[in-house]
Amino acid sequence: MPIILGYWNIRGLAHSIRLLLEYTDSSYEEKKYMMGDAPDYDRSQWLNEKFKLGLDFPNLPYLIDGTHKITQSNAILRYIARKHNLCGETEKEKIQEDILENQLMDNRMQLARLCYNPDFEKLKPEYLEGLPEMLKLYSQFLGKQPWFLGDKITFVDFIAYDVLERNQVFEPSCLDAFPNLKDFISRFEGLEKISAYMKSSRFLPRPVFTKMAVWGNK
């Protein structure tokens, strides 16, 4: 039976999961839930199923793989990564992996909070002002390595790609001062399975957020 990935019909938190499923050549199907238009943003497609799937903590995204039913995007990523040996191996790598995973989630949520805020236009300059400092830390961490933990790709590279690339969509010039981050994105997109997925009809780079967002809702 194929894996089932459930999420809104957007990029959102599922982007790195979809990329990891594709990279690992996993057999999966998507259950994409539609959200209604303003002002109600009807979520009944999801709410009608929310408590019928046997999820311990019902939420989107969810992944069902046989008897394994998982919510929380990073828990889903770690589950797939463990199956395919895409986690850090040494204690140092595991520590770096944990730090990166959480740091990336913090920065992902920073952008999301801004883009859902009614005062988006007022707050945007402050976000852009802090963006170079944020990206500089990732650039320093990556250094001359091909991947964030070294020579081996791991699941945190999939999160990093998503976070860095969506910031590039938000502010196209933001990576210009960080050639190693631009190279990282090119390297990731050049992976055979990823490149094929990006050319397929399954690829969903937009909308970044739901219809409730001020930016990234289309």
Swiss-Prot record:
It holds the Pfam family GST_C. Glutathione binds at residues 7-8, 43-46, 50, 59-60, 72-73. Its main location: cytoplasm. Keywords: Cytoplasm, Lipid metabolism, Phosphoprotein, Transferase. Residues 90-208 form the GST C-terminal domain. Gene3D superfamilies: 1.20.1050.10, Glutaredoxin. Substrate binds at residue 116. GO terms for cellular component: cytoplasm; intercellular bridge. Residues 2-88 form the GST N-terminal domain. The modification Phosphoserine is found at residues 27, 44. One of its GO terms (molecular function) is identical protein binding. The keyword Phosphoprotein applies. Belongs to the GST superfamily. Mu family. Homodimer. Conjugation of reduced glutathione to a wide number of exogenous and endogenous hydrophobic electrophiles. Participates in the formation of novel hepoxilin regioisomers. This is Glutathione S-transferase Mu 2. The gene is GSTM2.
